[in-house]
Amino acid sequence: SSRVLKVDCLDLPAKVYIRRDVSLTPEQVKLYMQMKKLALAKLESGELATTASVLTQIMRLQQICCGHLQPDDGEIQTVKSNRLNELLDITEEFQGKAIIWATYTHDIQQVADALRDRFGPESVATYYGATPQDERQQIVEDFQDSDNPLRFFVGQPKTGGYGITLTAANTVIYYSNSYDLEIRLQSEDRAHRIGQSNKVTYIDLVSPGTIDEKILGALRSKIDIAGQVLGEDVQDWLR
């Protein structure tokens, strides 16, 4: 209800949602099916008895959609993906500044490197757990300054999604989504708040027929996924 009141009171511009489909590569399909089979076997054997264990399997499936996999031993395995090229295509379709949210550190670094290669080193800043505290405010100020060449704010929603104002952007791209509804809502509001005079366009990158689609569907329906995955729905999430 407070969200409705916010719009009523502040008369903020509209939010527009766009979904961009990204097909999996054959390598991703193979790895995804293996991981899904493993997750369902663990479910059958009773290994996935906690919310955390189910969310870990969901996270691994999502990582594969993004083009990498980080198993328990921590060694990141990369897999050929179309997602980065799709993102670069999107950046050619709009003018002005943009926020790009990504759940995984590996993706933040890959996205930032690709954008720097295309648009120059001054055009990109990253904002996530490893960003030094004393640099964070300057990044926000530079981004908000229309004369500053910083065009792309590439961040992790759980780090940059709260409390900061990024109204210089009216394009927000979700390279990957958090399964935490509150993090999604808060990260949307970095651009959509007092000071925003333009409509804000939210673009979600989604691999059809995968966990991506289920996560986005739940978020759009304002469902907190962590509260959903342990009941009878758990098989649906992993199928």
Each model region followed by its residue ranges:
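Alpha-helical elements of the RecA-like P-loop NTPase motor core of helicases
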Residues: 30, 85, 109, 113, ...
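Conserved helicase ATPase core of P-loop NTP-dependent helicases/translocases
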Residues: 99-101, 109-110, 119-160
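A conserved SF2-helicase RecA2
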Residues: 179-239
